Every structure is written in structure tokens, then in C-alpha cells.
């Protein structure tokens, strides 16, 4: 029973952290100056060809980086 409670608490904590990081990502998309230089090093900019979202600076890929 204690193990179940601990596991439920851990899952809830992870869910809250995921929501918090998603909000931060959306906030940084609105203001690109908030992104760290390390995060954008080597990423592709708007209009460049991409195969996966992780290649783009803001992680939006539809054959080309959207942002």
C-alpha cells in the first residue's frame, strides 16, 4: 500500500513538472531572446529544410522549419 502511494505521488510530481516545462517552452517561443545560446547552437532557422522537429531551433518542422 505504501509503495502504491509513493508511486502515485511520483507520477503526479512528474506530470506537474512536464506541464511546467511545457509552459516554459511556450513562453520561450513567444520571446526567442529567452532561449539560451547553448540550446540553439547548431539548430536550423526558419525556412531551412528539416527532417525532424529536433533539428529546428524552436522544434516546429513541416519539411522546413516553421519558426
Curated annotation (Swiss-Prot):
Say where the protein is mainly found: secreted
Can you tell which superkingdom this protein's organism belongs to?
A: Eukaryota
Instruction: Tell me yes or no: is Plastid among this UniProt entry's keywords.
Output: no
Check the record and name the Pfam families matching this protein: Conotoxin
| Regions that span the bilayer | none
GO CC terms in record: extracellular region
Cell membrane as UniProt keyword = no
Q: Which residues form the propeptide?
A: 25-37
- Where does it live in the cell? Secreted
GO MF annotation, one: ion channel inhibitor activity
**Which tissues and organs express this gene's product?**
Expressed by the venom duct.
Q: Tell me which family the UniProt entry assigns to this protein.
A: Belongs to the conotoxin O1 superfamily.
Q: What is this protein called?
A: Conotoxin Cl6.10
Source organism of the structure: Californiconus californicus
Amino acid at each position: 500500500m505504501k509503495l502504491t502511494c509513493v508511486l502515485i505521488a511520483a507520477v503526479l510530481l512528474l506530470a506537474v513538472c512536464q506541464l511546467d516545462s511545457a509552459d516554459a517552452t511556450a513562453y520561450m517561443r513567444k520571446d526567442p531572446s529567452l532561449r539560451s545560446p547553448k540550446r540553439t547552437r547548431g539548430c536550423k532557422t526558419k525556412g531551412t529544410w528539416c527532417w525532424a522537429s529536433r533539428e529546428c531551433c524552436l522544434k516546429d518542422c513541416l519539411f522546413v522549419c516553421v519558426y
